[in-house]
Amino acid sequence: LRESVNPPVPAARAAIPVADIATRATELSNLLVTLTASAAAGANIGSIAKMLPDMSEKLDRQLAATTKTLDAEPSLDTLQSLQQDWQRRELATKGWLSQLTAQAIKLEEALTQLGDLQKTWGSTRAAAQETKAPDPILQQIDATLTAITVAQGKIQSERTALLELQSRVALEVTKCSTALTQIGQVQDKAVAGILAPDLPPIWQPKLWADALTA
């Protein structure tokens, strides 16, 4: 029998030496500014949020019109035209979704980084208190931990809004996929009808009866 291997226990975050706390706190302050700035929704994401309601309404109307057209058994040329239209719409909505996903990943990474920093500074606070560091040092550590918490809140808020927008865009991608699936099914049916032989199969009982009585 193979021996079970327990996962390694994560090492505790190393505390920052007291002599380095002031410098590291300044560096962290600059990092927090950078992280929160990069987490804010950019112009592209703002445009997506602004255009999405109109896009959603248009896709609803176009999907209803496409369904009606498909019910009328359109020609293969019409089906191909519909397919190309929906492929363009799908490409556009997937492009939006890709941008939102990239930003969501960036926010996840920022939150992970902040979580690690919070642990490091938490360990630093405990170590500084244990070694009876001067009050100004403890106050600086506390201010740094507060700044990390504030940054986490801002980025988490951006992430929540982004994920909500991402879900709404995903619904529009689904509409396009639904339309393309329906079009493909009707295309297959139309092609099968074209390829079906006009003559009745030779195994029809009536044909054999007619041949035997001829």
PLM feature spans:
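Flexible, low-complexity extramembrane segments of multi-pass membrane transporters/channels
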Residues: 1-214
